[in-house]
Amino acid sequence: MNLTELEEIGLKNVGKVYHNLGYDELIKHEIENKECILTTSGATAVDTGVFTGRSPKDKYIVDRDPSNRYIAWGDVNQKVSEEIFKELLEVAREQLSAKDLYVTDVYSGASVDSKHSIRFVTEIAWQAHFVKNMFIRPTELELKEFKPQFTVLNACKAVNDKWREHGLNSEVFVLFDIENNLSVIGGTWYGGELKKGIFSMMNYWLPLQNKLSMHCSANVGEKGDTALFFGLSGTGKTTLSTDPYRRLIGDDEHGWDDNGVFNFEGGCYAKVINLDGNNEPEIFNAIKSGALLENVVVNDKGEVDYNDGSKTENTRVSYPIEHIKNHETSLSAGHPENIIFLSADAFGILPPVSKLTREQAMYYFLSGYTAKVAGTERGITKPVATFSSCFGEAFLPLHPTVYAKLLGEKIDKHDVHVYLVNTGWTGGAYGVGTRMSIKDTRACINAILDGSIKESEFDTTKTFKLQVPKTLGNINPEILNPRNAWSDKEAFDKTTDMLANMFNENFKKYQVENSEFDYSEAGPKIES
C-alpha cells in the first residue's frame, strides 16, 4: 500500500506494512512472533492478556456537533472532549509509528446500499487475523479500489498514564470520533473491542437512514423463510441459529432494510466454554485452520480443553462463515417470518416457549432480559437479572426507542410472528432446577420455524400473561407451563413476583408522560 495513506493519519517512519495478508501468511507471522499456539485441529490459539472481555466503562465518544444531537449520552455512551481525544490519538500514533504494521481492509454490511469500508491498523498479527475472520472480506478487485470510510487504530500496547487527570475510568481507552471517521484503542488486546466497536458505529449510521440494526443471529430455511434470534451473550444465539437444516446468514449482527435482512459480518464469534462436538457439531467442526481461539487452555500436545475456564469463562473462537458448511453465501435473505427473543432465565420463571402479542414483543424487546449466574464472595451462587434494551444496549449510540420504533414498524409491515424462548432453567431457579436441555430448546425452535406451534392449544400464565402451548411435539408437557415444573409452588409464586418487580422497575424509564413506548400494560402484573 501507499505509505502516504498511513502518514495522512499521523503515523511516521513506519517499518514494513503487511497489507491484507492471506491466512497462511498471517498464521506464519503469529507463529514467528510467538503470538499463538498451533492446536491439533489446525486452529491457532492466542491469549488476549489481562482483558478477556470488553471494557465498556472505557468506551467514549467525542462530544461534537452534529453527532452529539443524536447520541443517547449516559453510562453506555460517555462523552470525551476533542482535546482529550487528540491527546490520546497522539499516544496511539506514537505507539504505532516506527513499527511494522498489519493493515487489513474489510467491509461491514452485506447490503450494497448499507456496507461501510473499514480499515484496521495494528502491530499484532493475530488481531489482523481476527478482523479478517470477523468482517466481510473484499474481492481482489474491490481491494484494488478500496477507500476506507472509517479507520481503527489499535495501539493495544499503549496506555493512558493521565487517565485520572483526564477524568476517565482507567488507563484503557476505546474512543470514537464520529465526524472524523476514526476509532482509537489503547490498553486492551481483546479482539471483541474491534468487532463491537464497528457494530456500535453501524448502530449509529443505519437507523439515521431508517434502516434497523440488530444484535441478533439469523438463518433461512429451504423455502426462503427467514428467522431472527435476539439475545444477550450466553443465551444461545450462535448455537441455535447454527442449524444443519437451515442456512446460516450470520450469528450476531444484522441489518434490516427495505430489501430484507443482511449480515454485518463475514464470520462468527462463538463461545467455546464446555464445547461438545456432539451437541454443537457445526461449531466444533468449524475450529480448523483459519479459526482463531481465544483464552483456551492448550496442553503440550496442542490439544484444547474446552471444559477448562481457568483463564476465563469467556473463551471464544472466531472463524470465517465459510467454515459453517450450511451458510447463506449472499449473507442476506428476505424479510423474516419469525423473530425469537432468547432469555437464559436463571430464576426458572419464564416458559420454554411463549407466543407474544405485538405489544408484548415491544415490551420484551425494550426490556432485553436475561439472567446470569454470578459467584458471591462466600462461594454461593445466585442468579442476577440483566436488562439490556433491544438485547444490546451496550452497543447502541442512539436511544433504544429509535430501534424499537423501527422494529415495530417492520413487524407490522411484514406481519412477523414473535416468540420468547427461555434457554435457562426449569423446575426451579439455578441451584435447584435444571438447565433447559438443548434438545428441548431446539424442539421449541423447530416448532416455531416449521409452523407446527400454531396448531397447539395455548394457556395463559399468571402474572406474566404469556401464551404457552399445552402440548408441543415430544416435549414433556409438564415443563411447558413453568409453574407445573416446580415441585415447590409457593417458592415459584414468590420468585415470580420477585422477577415481575424487577421487570416493572426496569421499565419505569419508558413510562414517561405521552410516551408512545409505554408498553408497561404488556408486562407482568402481580396478583394480590
UniProtKB/Swiss-Prot annotation:
<dbReference type="GO" id="GO:0004612">
    <property type="term" value="F:phosphoenolpyruvate carboxykinase (ATP) activity"/>
</dbReference>
<comment type="similarity">
    <text>Belongs to the phosphoenolpyruvate carboxykinase (ATP) family.</text>
</comment>
<keyword id="KW-0312">Gluconeogenesis</keyword>
<comment type="function">
    <text>Involved in the gluconeogenesis. Catalyzes the conversion of oxaloacetate (OAA) to phosphoenolpyruvate (PEP) through direct phosphoryl transfer between the nucleoside triphosphate and OAA.</text>
</comment>
<feature type="binding site">
    <location>
        <position position="280"/>
    </location>
    <ligand>
        <name>ATP</name>
    </ligand>
</feature>
<dbReference type="Pfam" id="PF01293">
    <property type="entry name" value="PEPCK_ATP"/>
</dbReference>
<feature type="binding site">
    <location>
        <position position="215"/>
    </location>
    <ligand>
        <name>ATP</name>
    </ligand>
</feature>
<keyword id="KW-0067">ATP-binding</keyword>
<dbReference type="InterPro" id="IPR001272">
    <property type="entry name" value="PEP_carboxykinase_ATP"/>
</dbReference>
<feature type="binding site">
    <location>
        <position position="54"/>
    </location>
    <ligand>
        <name>substrate</name>
    </ligand>
</feature>
<feature type="binding site">
    <location>
        <position position="441"/>
    </location>
    <ligand>
        <name>ATP</name>
    </ligand>
</feature>
<feature type="binding site">
    <location>
        <position position="252"/>
    </location>
    <ligand>
        <name>Mn(2+)</name>
    </ligand>
</feature>
<feature type="binding site">
    <location>
        <position position="196"/>
    </location>
    <ligand>
        <name>substrate</name>
    </ligand>
</feature>
<feature type="binding site">
    <location>
        <position position="316"/>
    </location>
    <ligand>
        <name>ATP</name>
    </ligand>
</feature>
<keyword id="KW-0210">Decarboxylase</keyword>
<feature type="binding site">
    <location>
        <position position="196"/>
    </location>
    <ligand>
        <name>Mn(2+)</name>
    </ligand>
</feature>
<dbReference type="GO" id="GO:0005829">
    <property type="term" value="C:cytosol"/>
</dbReference>
<protein>
    <recommendedName>
        <fullName>Phosphoenolpyruvate carboxykinase (ATP)</fullName>
        <ecNumber>4.1.1.49</ecNumber>
    </recommendedName>
</protein>
<dbReference type="InterPro" id="IPR015994">
    <property type="entry name" value="PEPCK_ATP_CS"/>
</dbReference>
<dbReference type="InterPro" id="IPR013035">
    <property type="entry name" value="PEP_carboxykinase_C"/>
</dbReference>
<keyword id="KW-0456">Lyase</keyword>
<keyword id="KW-0547">Nucleotide-binding</keyword>
<dbReference type="GO" id="GO:0046872">
    <property type="term" value="F:metal ion binding"/>
</dbReference>
<dbReference type="GO" id="GO:0006094">
    <property type="term" value="P:gluconeogenesis"/>
</dbReference>
<keyword id="KW-0963">Cytoplasm</keyword>
<dbReference type="InterPro" id="IPR008210">
    <property type="entry name" value="PEP_carboxykinase_N"/>
</dbReference>
<dbReference type="GO" id="GO:0005524">
    <property type="term" value="F:ATP binding"/>
</dbReference>
<feature type="binding site">
    <location>
        <begin position="231"/>
        <end position="239"/>
    </location>
    <ligand>
        <name>ATP</name>
    </ligand>
</feature>
<keyword id="KW-0464">Manganese</keyword>
<feature type="binding site">
    <location>
        <position position="215"/>
    </location>
    <ligand>
        <name>Mn(2+)</name>
    </ligand>
</feature>
<feature type="binding site">
    <location>
        <position position="316"/>
    </location>
    <ligand>
        <name>substrate</name>
    </ligand>
</feature>
<keyword id="KW-0479">Metal-binding</keyword>
<feature type="binding site">
    <location>
        <position position="190"/>
    </location>
    <ligand>
        <name>substrate</name>
    </ligand>
</feature>
<feature type="binding site">
    <location>
        <position position="196"/>
    </location>
    <ligand>
        <name>ATP</name>
    </ligand>
</feature>
<comment type="pathway">
    <text>Carbohydrate biosynthesis; gluconeogenesis.</text>
</comment>
